[in-house]
């Protein structure tokens, strides 16, 4: 974990409620895909944990959805704003377990961390495919970015406006894969448990207070006792959480 100041160099809407923010600063503490950062926003006491969509040596890309006061403040922050950011939080995904053809599953705001993971898997010479779940066509984001990596992109929309009508599970049941990685809400994970045929990793979106393990506000029950999503996760093996 490292604390530093980052400058907003991009902050724009991708959909009506989903925004892309690019921050410039020292990203050296980020060592794995699937980690998250904690932002201190103006006039807010608690930091806001946001998953990392992508990063390089000098920039950090975050994709966030306006769901409350904090993210509404984020959407209005002008370019040039300096933010206090904790980077390098969480464990991230283990790509050594993926096999040659893993499937990446993202639902809603669980989509962003899948992007950097996909880039890493492609760089390792593997052949991932991605399944993205949204409510409707107007809510789709990042699909073209995934496609630009040269990997298959499957989309499920609840209303059938794009891709498969239904949920990610309606796509997954017809796919072949060696392993899976996922990020999304618990209802999606529970539905996936009915169709997934391999081992895999789930990244949880539990509500966090501190973001680094002190407040115990994001604990979940696992096969090895209670674990903190922010400190012990957010990524857990399938066998740990759905034994």
Q: Where are each of the predicted segments found?
A:
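Structural signal for conserved beta-strand scaffold positions within catalytic alpha/beta enzyme cores
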Residues: 10, 54, 155-157, 202-204, ...
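Short microdomains enriched in Cys/His and/or Lys/Arg
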Residues: 234-243
